[in-house]
Amino acid sequence: MARRLIRPRRWDPPRLADSGATAELSVSRRLPTGGVGPEDVVFDHAGRVVAGLAGGRVVRIDPASGERAVLAETGGRPLGLHPRADGGVLVCDHDKGLLEVGVDGSVTRLVDVAFPSNVVEASDGTIWFTTSTTRWTLDEYLGDVFEHSCTGRLMRRAPDGTVTTVLDGLKFANGLVLAPDESHLLVAETAGYRIQRHWPSGRTEVFADNLPGFPDNMWLGSDGLVWVAIVAPRNALLDRLLPLPGFLRLLVWNLPQAVQPKAAPIASVMAFTLDGRLVHDLRTAGGSYGFVTSVAERDGLVVLGSLTESDVAVLGNSHA
């Protein structure tokens, strides 16, 4: 079956720089989810892990005992999550839009939107969320990376339900963090190898640029650090193709998948201070846990999620 036609946009990516010393990313144990693909993992206010799975289930796992409960069935594909103080969860569902899961397991659609990716909520009830692309689906995400469509958005849902686009033209908008004082947000641009800082007043600046890979979901840990999942390292062939005439990417896109650029099997997470200083750069090559799409930290415990794995991984490194 022929692949969808891409509309390549030229972009000159920054030359990959050496990020300096890295530490080994070591998985000490796994927490079974009872399903596949815990794409985003977060801690609720009681310290339990919450994850969304392929097939629509949102599950809660006690990281000490492994005890598991199903919070809700969305009927779609849950991606980014945000735990609410009352025990409910905001869910970015690829198929259903931005959802609210109540403590009773009820599911309510708040915004009918395609490919919502991550979400945070302010103390006044304002909800901020990203949409990754208006051109492609989750199953076709590589098309957006190849095309560089720049159709990602940061959006805002006001307490009265009004929805507005705050930023557009983003390079596959993804992870989202709200600063502790709620003065600004951090937005990951997966296909732009960077994280932007945005003030609701309208100012936007680069928080972290020229990352060694594709940043995915993010989490503000109890340690005050911004934890970032790097879903895959940058690909040298793709970086060479992006600034060249688009027909070259068209040619490569239509080649057999076996000869196209592929993600290297490297698991990676990074952690930054709120002023953008890199504190942790954890990597492992060819490890037992791959395609890391999310990371969360609470009281020194660091967990990972993945679009393809069946379990939530618990790191053995001490980050307290």
Indicate residue ranges for each PLM-predicted region.
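Sequence-structural signature of mature extracellular/luminal beta-sheet repeat domains
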Residues: M1-A320
